[in-house]
């Protein structure tokens, strides 16, 4: 903020609104006055219920600057458990976006409810941003927190069971932001683009925290749009864009007339949040000529491994990030050698989350010696991580461990197949039998025999 106050920190394409580092500095100091007046201190929680917006990221940064704890919840994905989540967080302040149907939840919350409102650089701000205008924009209030105090709480979808919050300390958050900026290779003047929710860890690290600590610019959209995605990358001279495998599939299944030549500023797109099949990867690069990289991590372990764009090794996740120690263990907990397959452990002490915020409001500490990812994989001779499946998804057929992802990757090589999914079902003799489902491209319908023969050509009987 002091060295580049006029540089843009975040711009939202839907709002057509930008927030500079200088304006963020002023807003953060005003927000610090707002929180201090209400007596908030370290580990007191500010709950943010909002969609992607300039205001969202302004509050995120401002809360961390003051030293309180910011709790984020994806309203739509956690709708069934929202009241329980709010009760577990026990926020001192609830900042909410109007128009999301949150009235009942807000009424049941213990903390002070304040509409988020709109920030306008030229005046006429509303909600919170009108409320904080009476406070000084100068840096007169010191942070109330230390590095080991809680900085961020975020939630998973909660579609299977009651969701748990994941707690990062202020130090943990910073180390993740710094490691992410390092592997992305971004700094002042660089622009990244994201359209994923900032209620999720991945977007928080990659396109909020990494630009914040490096002085880069985040260009955001509220949602993904297949027809507008490449236009955004072109219009805003994006250097690095963030995708997930679903976006890659959508851009493959319904191609857009664009190529790398149309995007001269774009260095690469990086995919995360789920494994990217090698076939998807090669097909995307072949179709568009745009480099794809991949990264992996977890809510508990933070960003863990990633390619540095051009040094990508297709079919792998990439090497460990600078604060991470990644290793693989067998069923007895013994470390395995390079090339040997087992469960992947992320032992990034400085990037590892503190613990879980449980549904009853209690805190469950995470082990300090590493996070069991639940992923199966190995590390190759170049130090690149490979993920081959999930421990819980393993199909055990007649005593043989079969990774569904291995079968999926073969199925999608068939020219008629768009997507594939493999599961295990009970079998009276083998214990489990393999069953696979495929979604075919429009107008194509290969026979069962054809698909079985295709699999036999690449898989053992």
Indicate residue ranges for each PLM-predicted region.
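Conserved pre-ATP/AMP-binding loop-to-beta segment of ANL
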Residues: 5-8, 118-120, 134-155, 162, ...
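Conserved AMP-binding/adenylate-forming core of the ANL superfamily
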Residues: 9-53, 57-61, 78-83, 87, ...
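Conserved AMP-binding A3 loop
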Residues: 18-22, 144, 151-175
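AMP-binding/adenylate-forming catalytic core of the ANL superfamily
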Residues: 77, 94-96, 233, 241, ...
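ANL superfamily adenylate-forming
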Residues: 99-147, 254-255
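Conserved AMP-binding/adenylation subdomain of ANL enzymes
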Residues: 174-191, 199-240, 254
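Gly/Ser/Thr-rich phosphate-binding loop
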Residues: 213, 238-243, 254-314, 322-325, ...
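Conserved ATP/PPi-binding loop(s) of AMP-dependent carboxylate-activating enzymes
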Residues: 319-323, 334-364, 402
